[in-house]
Structures are given as C-alpha cells and as structure tokens.
From Swiss-Prot:
Its main location: cytoplasm. The gene is rsmG. The keyword Ligase does not apply. It comes from the Bacteria. It comes from Sinorhizobium medicae (strain WSM419) (Ensifer medicae). This is Ribosomal RNA small subunit methyltransferase G. Transmembrane segments: none annotated. Pfam families: GidB. Belongs to the methyltransferase superfamily. RNA methyltransferase RsmG family. One of its GO terms (molecular function) is rRNA (guanine-N7-)-methyltransferase activity.
Length: 213
C-alpha cells in the first residue's frame, strides 16, 4: 500500500499527517462507493492516481491558503482533498456545494472524520453566491464545459475589483471549450499540465468579464 501511495503522490509535498487523513478518506470513500455512485466504478481501482492525486495538484497550484468554493463536489474531488490539505495551514476554508442529499451526507462524514477545513452546502450551484457571497478561489472537476463553468463563477468573478481565481480540471478537448468560451467571456488564462494525464490540464482563470455586444 505504501509503495503504491508514494508512487501515486509522485513527489508532491504532502505531510505525514495529511497522508494519514487522505488514507482515511480513501477508506471511507471505498465504503460509501458501494452504495452511492460517487465516481465511475471503472476508476475505483485507480483511486489514488485518478482522483486523489488529481485533486492534490490543484491545491498545490494555489500560492496561499484561501477561502475556496468547490462546485458540484460530488465524491469530494477536489473539494474534500483541498480541505484536508488546508488542515496543514492556520487559515483557509472550503465551501462544498452539492445538491444531491446522499452525496452531501457523505461529504459531511468525510469532513468530520478527517478534521478537514470545510462546510457542506446542500444547495444548487445557482443558489451558492447568495449563501457564500465572497471567495478567493473556485474549483470544479468533471462538472460542465468551460462556458457553463464561467457562468456559474460569474457572480463571484465579474464584480468590480474581484480577485477571485478559478481552477478547472479539463481533458484532451480543452482547447475546443476555450474557443467556445471566449465568444462570451474575456479572461486571463494559464494552462497547467496535469501530473496525472499527459493530455489533460488544469485551467486557471482570472479577471473574468462578459463580452459586450
């Protein structure tokens, strides 16, 4: 187990205490996944690399602890993993937005049992800005295409003087999504190569605004 874990972490800087919390989360996840569809069943055998490592890389792209909003948190990737990683810091908090009650119940258990820094909001994404009016960072994974993700993020990112940044995991067709999104929005974009899949990226978006006709 330890050898495969070290291989999965691939040299990322993670403390022993955080690794123990991640191991406990993985155990909880496998248990709950037997009765709730948290991720594609075909990926369960590669949980550490496909899901946990993929989430850790996002947290490590952020230079400082932040108040995060994780949209469509589902099985906890990347929201719970980010909240666990924030346990190493003295600040920062993750708001996990998940409207599915069964998944929200799992997320609450995962946060509680790993002493992670987060809160679950069992609401629709469109309702989240009213409940969480400000944030420093937004994340989403396997949720929607880039144009729709930017629509979700607009209430936080298009307000005057907003410094909110967003991180989105994207697969091989990410450039097509970017080309579509730029017809509706202007934004600064950084493409981070994925440490998990060679043809995938993490898109970092900042300075979002709507295009005027």
């Amino acid at each position: 187990m330890q050898t495969s874990l070290n291989r999965a972490l691939n040299g990322l800087r993670v403390s022993r205490e955080t690794v123990e919390k991640l191991e406990h989360f993985a155990s909880l996840f496998q248990k709950w996944a037997r009765s709730i569809n948290l991720v594609a069943p075909s990926t369960l055998d590669d949980l550490w690399r496909r899901h946990i490592l993929d989430s850790i890389q996002l947290f490590q792209l952020s230079p400082a602890p932040k108040t995060w909003v994780d949209l469509g948190s589902g099985g906890g990737f990347p929201g719970v993993i980010t909240a666990i990683c924030l346990s190493e810091t003295e600040s920062g908090w993750v708001h996990l937005v998940e409207s599915n009650n069964k998944k929200a119940a799992f997320l609450r258990v995962a946060l509680r049992e790993t002493a992670a820094r987060g809160t679950v909001h069992p609401i629709r994404i469109e309702e989240a800005p009213a409940e969480i009016p400000t944030c420093d960072a937004i994340s989403a994974r396997a949720l929607s295409d880039l144009s729709q993700l930017l629509e979700y993020c607009a209430p936080w990112m298009t307000v005057e003087a907003s410094r909110t940044i967003a991180f989105f995991h994207k697969g091989r067709d990410y450039q097509l999504e970017i080309d579509k999104a730029v017809s509706r929005f202007q934004f600064d974009l950084v493409k981070h190569a994925s440490v998990v899949e060679p043809d995938s990226v993490v898109l970092e978006v900042a300075n979002l605004s709507r295009r005027t006709k």
